[in-house]
């Protein structure tokens, strides 16, 4: 495994939440594809580029367990959401989460939608439901996994929300979720999910996708062609979209059940270890389930110690954020904890 992800050979990489790793095989595919473009020029664009995008849609439909007609390629999660918001009536009231990914609030604000926010807490899902009962909302928009704290929204709770508010449109930023956790779009009650490929899907930059229910398009009185027209202003990079298709196919070749189980085990192990050391925010420690992303309460000096020990992570707010993916090992987590314990003594 490590040989396919060269970065893993020279560091303890706990930074997938910031940037997923390139595989050696993806690099080889991109190199061969670029050389094909060099040789064929316009024929590459008119022939192979089309098939590359078709394959990306096909692989994503398998990953998301949905029909290909529900998949729309974009350059990123934010680009897809930004475009899609153009088709939502301006009088719709949004419910957001406080301290969610900043661009979500910024886009809703830029589009001049009225919105309210629910504060982060250990009982977030119940707080969302309570707020929905207090006043009328047309759209609930949130990240499945919080980029900062790593809080994992209980996706099973969506059913309870939809049962009580069947007309509510639920839109989800799945960038920190898809590729990390199991998900079945057709069985879910989410109306639309927006994803970037460069984190947990390990697809490099410049690619992403939307997954939209037909019932949502009908509700908004728009067609798939309307969505394509929103996203196809200009052009997409075939190499970026092809990388998404290749990376998703490669990820599925590892057996997704094994990938997700490994993530669950590593995440639980790290969660308990950090909770024991009192390094997590209280509202995170009090929850039963968590993602594989953690922001720990340590200062900049400790961040520098982690860097000196060749542990890749990133500063977030007043703490340090780490994340584990299937290519990490328990030994790497133990090494991180060892460095951490030694530094805080």
Predicted regions located by residue number:
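PLP-dependent enzyme catalytic core of the Aspartate aminotransferase-like
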Residues: 1-3, 305-345
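Glycine-rich phosphate-binding segment of PLP-dependent enzymes
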Residues: 7-13, 17-50
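Structural signature of PLP-dependent enzymes
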Residues: 44-46, 229-271
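Conserved beta-loop-alpha segment that forms the PLP phosphate-binding cup at the N-terminus of a helix
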Residues: 49-92, 102-104
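PLP-dependent aminotransferase-like
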Residues: 79, 83-139
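Active-site phosphate-binding strand-loop segment of PLP-dependent enzymes
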Residues: 123-175, 179
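Active-site PLP attachment segment
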Residues: 188-223
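Conserved PLP-binding catalytic core of the aspartate aminotransferase-like
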Residues: 264, 268, 277-309, 324
